[in-house]
């Protein structure tokens, strides 16, 4: 997708850079980072991340730095207006989702309710 089109989900430079390095380590340029939402966690829904070389019908792909972030339509409806970022700190390193649709989140930030 073009950089001048408003996207429903932001894929940050830090996240794209980390994905680029992880894909290089796997030696499979077809891999993309898939973010998804499942039921569970202490707040009702939880975020999940996996590498996937498949893009399914209806999936949205956001390209940055030559790598892709893939989101299925069911998950996207809960993520609109949010961002996928990557952080490194005292708590470790991880991909994180900032979700303006979440009414509450758990302490670790991996689950939420709407």
From Swiss-Prot:
GO MF annotations, alphabetized: 2 iron, 2 sulfur cluster binding; 4 iron, 4 sulfur cluster binding; iron ion binding
Xref: InterPro entries: FeS_biogenesis (IPR000361), FeS_cluster_insertion (IPR016092), FeS_cluster_insertion_CS (IPR017870), FeS_cluster_insertion_RrpA (IPR023063), HesB-like_dom_sf (IPR035903)
A GO cellular component annotation in the UniProt record: cytosol
Gene3D superfamilies given in the database record: HesB-like domain
Keywords: Iron, Iron-sulfur, Metal-binding
Requisite cofactors: iron-sulfur cluster
Chain sites annotated for binding iron-sulfur cluster: 42, 106, 108
Signal peptide from the UniProt entry: none
Highest taxon above the source species: Bacteria
UniProt-listed GO biological process terms: iron-sulfur cluster assembly
Cofactor note: Binds 1 iron-sulfur cluster per subunit.
SUPFAM superfamilies the record matches: HesB-like domain
Role according to the record: Required for insertion of 4Fe-4S clusters for at least IspG.
PANTHER family on file: IRON-SULFUR CLUSTER ASSEMBLY 2 HOMOLOG, MITOCHONDRIAL (PTHR43011:SF1)
Subunit structure: Homodimer.
Similarity field: Belongs to the HesB/IscA family.
The protein's name in its UniProt record: Iron-sulfur cluster insertion protein ErpA
């Amino acid at each position: 997708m073009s950089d001048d089109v408003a996207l429903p989900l932001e894929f940050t430079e830090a996240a794209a850079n980390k994905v680029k390095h992880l894909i290089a380590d796997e030696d499979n340029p077809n891999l993309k980072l898939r973010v998804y939402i499942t039921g569970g966690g202490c707040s009702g829904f939880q975020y999940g991340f996996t590498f996937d070389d498949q893009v399914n019908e209806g999936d949205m792909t956001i390209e940055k730095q030559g790598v892709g972030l893939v989101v299925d339509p069911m998950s996207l409806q809960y993520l609109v207006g949010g961002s996928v970022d990557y952080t490194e700190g005292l708590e470790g390193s991880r991909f994180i989702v900032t979700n303006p649709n979440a009414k509450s989140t758990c302490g670790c930030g991996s689950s939420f309710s709407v």
